[in-house]
Regions:
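Electron-transfer interface patches adjacent to heme c in soluble/periplasmic c-type cytochromes
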Residues: 103-109
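N-proximal helix/coil linker or "cap" segments that precede and/or mark the start of modular domains
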Residues: 18-32
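Conserved redox-active cysteine motifs that mediate thiol-disulfide chemistry
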Residues: 56-72
Length: 155
């Protein structure tokens, strides 16, 4: 019985420690290393069978704040994001444009911009978020269709 308890405790502790390795950012931070953040996101995505969304923008960007609020406050969107995606904020600002990191992806025309990656970090899609806008917010149906199109297949 003690061996079973010890095994379960170690298994739980290992899962807890691994889960602590990836912590989503709440803000765009010019001091963060996007390569390190992506590496942690890939590890987490592989263990949870999720895709990754690189959310490129900055604290200066009003639409970046609008999309954050929309994703957080729209129940159906938040549910899809929580179940199928790992979000990584990539800063683009005058303090740090992360040009070297972003040079490995297609050119961006505006912010915020999403890159959808599979759990191994392979680019699946480049999304101009302007296509998801509606008036001064985002279109729930378009956003849900986008998330459903690029979510991973669960095995």
């Amino acid at each position: 019985m003690k061996k079973i308890f010890l095994f379960i405790s170690i298994l739980f502790l290992g899962t807890f420690v691994f889960a602590q390795e990836y912590t989503p950012q709440e803000k765009f931070d010019p001091d963060r290393n996007p390569n390190d953040d992506l590496k942690a996101a890939i590890n987490y995505a592989q263990s949870t069978n999720k895709n990754i969304i690189l959310d490129v923008g900055g604290e200066w960007c009003i639409w970046c704040h609008r999309i954050d609020a929309f994703m957080h406050n729209t129940k159906e969107v938040k549910s899809l994001l929580d179940e199928y995606y790992v979000i990584v904020k990539i800063n683009f600002s005058k303090e740090n444009k992360n040009e070297k990191f972003l040079s490995t992806y297609p050119a961006i025309e505006g912010y915020p911009h999403f890159f959808v990656l599979d759990k191994n970090g392979k680019l699946l899609h480049s999304q101009n978020t302007g296509e998801l806008e509606k008036d001064k917010d985002y279109d729930k149906d378009k956003f849900i269709a986008f998330l459903n199109k690029w979510k991973p297949t669960k095995k």
